[in-house]
């Protein structure tokens, strides 16, 4: 069972912040009395670039496609993966760590994002 959410942000740092906050909150939820025996997890993919808006609720573009692939097919529970463009835009941040990843099926570079210790 899976649900997808697409959210647009003015810059990629905000998208990363929200993804990491979702992971934190789900970890708290999973330790609460409301949690089931199966943990609730989030897999996130983040891209950065121009999108083509098609009506009020749909957008398309290369980075949207890459982010979707990363979030839906590659990321594991509580993992945020970002494209090269996201990495390049926010690489100077000291509060997060980027780990370059390899995947045989993908033709584009991507990174795993975690909070710095």
Feature roles, as predicted:
Residues 69-70, 89:
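Generic structural signal for isolated residues within well-ordered alpha-helices
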Residues 55-58, 78-80:
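Catalytic cores and conserved motifs of cyclic dinucleotide signaling enzymes
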Residues 1-3:
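Short glycine- and acidic-residue-rich catalytic loops of nucleotidyl-transferase/cyclase enzymes
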Residues 58-62, 94-96:
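Short, surface-exposed, charged loop/turn segments at secondary-structure junctions
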Residues 77-117:
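Intrinsically disordered, glycine/charged-rich C-terminal tails and inter-domain linkers
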């Amino acid at each position: 069972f899976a649900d997808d959410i697409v959210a647009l942000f003015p810059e990629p740092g905000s998208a990363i912040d929200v993804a990491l906050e979702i992971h934190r909150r789900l970890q708290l939820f999973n330790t609460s009395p409301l949690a089931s025996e199966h943990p609730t997890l989030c897999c996130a993919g983040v891209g950065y670039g121009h999108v083509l808006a098609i009506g009020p609720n749909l957008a398309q573009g290369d980075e949207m496609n890459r982010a979707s692939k990363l979030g839906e097919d590659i990321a594991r529970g509580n993992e945020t993966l970002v494209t090269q463009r996201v990495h390049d835009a926010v690489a100077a941040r000291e509060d997060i760590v980027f780990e370059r990843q390899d995947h045989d099926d993908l033709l584009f570079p991507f990174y795993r994002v975690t909070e710095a210790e």
